[in-house]
Amino acid sequence: MTTIDLNCDLGESFGAYKMGNDDEILPFVSSINVACGFHAGDPSVMRQTVEKAMQHNVAIGAHPGFPDLIGFGRRNMNVSASEVYDYVLYQIGALDTFVKAAGGKMHHVKPHGALYNMAATNPEIADAIAKAIYHSNPSLLFYGLANSEAFIQAAEKYNITLVQEAFADRTYKQDGTLTSRTEENALIKNEEEAIKQVLQMVKEGYVNSVNGEKVAVQAQTICLHGDGEKAVQFARRIYRTFENNEISICTPK
């Protein structure tokens, strides 16, 4: 049977501001990426998200981003590799403490937003993230964009496990990178199209680029976004689609 991990970014609320549909999404995913206070989240939200994830037996990962609350971590920053290392190590440590306090064990690290996209094409940034993971806990898995040579080489250098990721509702360019959110066609808003894309990636190993060309994708995890209007409905449909197609949802080891 084909197996796949379903991951989602959660814990993005901050103070009085509520983001996402965390409680409703949790039953349909196998792993989550928790914001660590830089681009979103706060200490109380981090603790609550960890505790809820453990109740659902969902794997918990850190979701470190740039220190950019206003831009939600989606704006590129002109920072050095050394600064990226510090940012990521700091955020991993913060979440790991909450996980340990709840009696759990952290599973993975997935960079967020602009940090993720920069690392996918910038070997120095990817290296800094991988080094921070290695120095924090080399058994942590590294979630990164499928086919990214920068991610692959960084994981190999530090002998950490890379879990290659694809996206359910994002479009792809010919080189296998994600279409920038600044472009109109970055998101797939039609549920049927998104489900078709996911099945192509999981069962057939490819995705159609925005130019209509087939791009090989060997994904081990699929990211669902939990903050859209129909996010819960979409998560439920993906979950049932996998069941109907004999695709087992499970956490990567």
Curated annotation (Swiss-Prot):
| Keywords on record | ATP-binding, Hydrolase, Nucleotide-binding
Q: Which reactions are catalysed by this chain?
A: 5-oxo-L-proline + ATP + 2 H2O = L-glutamate + ADP + phosphate + H(+)
The coiled-coil segments of this chain are none
GO MF annotation terms: 5-oxoprolinase (ATP-hydrolyzing) activity; ATP binding
The record, for InterPro entries, names:
Glyco_hydro/deAcase_b/a-brl, LamB/YcsF/PxpA-like
The yes or no answer to whether the keyword Iron-sulfur is present is no
First-level EC class: hydrolase
GO BP field: carbohydrate metabolic process
What Pfam families does the record tag this protein with? LamB_YcsF (PF03746)
Q: What is its EC number?
A: 3.5.2.9
Gene3D superfamilies named among the record's database cross-references: Glycoside hydrolase/deacetylase
Which family does the record assign? Belongs to the LamB/PxpA family.
Q: Which NCBIfam families match?
A: PRK05406.1-2, PRK05406.1-3, PRK05406.1-5
- Subunit relationships: Forms a complex composed of PxpA, PxpB and PxpC.
The role this protein plays is:
Catalyzes the cleavage of 5-oxoproline to form L-glutamate coupled to the hydrolysis of ATP to ADP and inorganic phosphate.
Protein name listed in UniProt: 5-oxoprolinase subunit A
| Organism field | Bacillus cereus (strain ZK / E33L)
